[in-house]
């Protein structure tokens, strides 16, 4: 039990966890970051089409392009789920367990994109701190993003917790 002066009480007494869960649902809905992922994939596709130092463009690597396309398909599906969820929120409904799905898939897509960037940057991604003298462009940021966004699967409730929420509330397990 926590004692709070009546002047500092927010909402009804004893409803703190209920309010916290609603706030977490909204945070998870926003964790999908589809707009950022879409921009990063578009930029990566443009970079893959360019030849670097006379080497064939990465766009000619079928395995890389297959992986890129798979992430694009996942992202497109996530965008539709996000739009449906946002439409429900706009009509006055609270985000439900789909917010867990948005967070789960959104962060996994972000990490898949970071992995593609690391693969595309090759050895230019090795420096953790950006050094303008290394690489053709922004490759050195790949490692920074890759390591920094490992946290995405932890904040707003770890992805393992999101899987449990989905199993309980969506699948009825």
Model-derived segments and their meaning:
Residues 14-26, 30-34, 121-173:
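Glycine-rich phosphate/cofactor-binding loops in nucleotide/flavin-utilizing enzymes
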Residues 1-78, 152, 168:
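Glycine-rich beta->alpha junctions and the first turn(s) of the following alpha-helix
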Residues 3-5, 25-26, 46, 50, ...:
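Short, well-ordered loop/turn and helix-capping segments at boundaries between secondary-structure elements
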Residues 59-62, 76-134:
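C-terminal helix-coil-helix/basic helical segment that borders enzyme active sites and/or dimer interfaces
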Residues 12, 60, 67-77, 94, ...:
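Secondary-structure capping and boundary motifs in well-ordered enzyme cores
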């Amino acid at each position: 039990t926590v004692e709070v002066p009546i002047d500092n009480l927010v909402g009804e007494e004893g409803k703190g966890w209920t309010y916290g869960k609603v706030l977490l649902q909204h945070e998870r809905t926003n964790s999908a970051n589809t707009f950022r992922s879409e921009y990063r994939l578009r930029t990566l596709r443009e970079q893959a089409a360019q030849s670097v130092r006379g080497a064939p463009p990465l766009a000619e690597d079928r395995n890389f392009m297959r992986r890129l396309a798979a992430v694009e398909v996942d992202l497109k599906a996530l965008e539709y789920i996000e739009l449906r969820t946002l439409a429900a929120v706009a009509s006055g409904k609270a985000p439900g367990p789909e917010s867990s799905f948005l967070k789960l898939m959104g962060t996994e897509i972000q990490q898949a994109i970071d992995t593609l960037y690391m693969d595309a940057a090759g050895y230019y991604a090795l420096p953790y701190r950006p050094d303008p003298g290394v690489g053709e462009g922004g490759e050195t940021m790949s490692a920074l993003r890759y390591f920094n966004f490992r946290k995405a699967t932890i904040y707003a409730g770890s992805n393992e917790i999101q899987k449990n929420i989905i199993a309980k509330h969506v699948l009825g397990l």
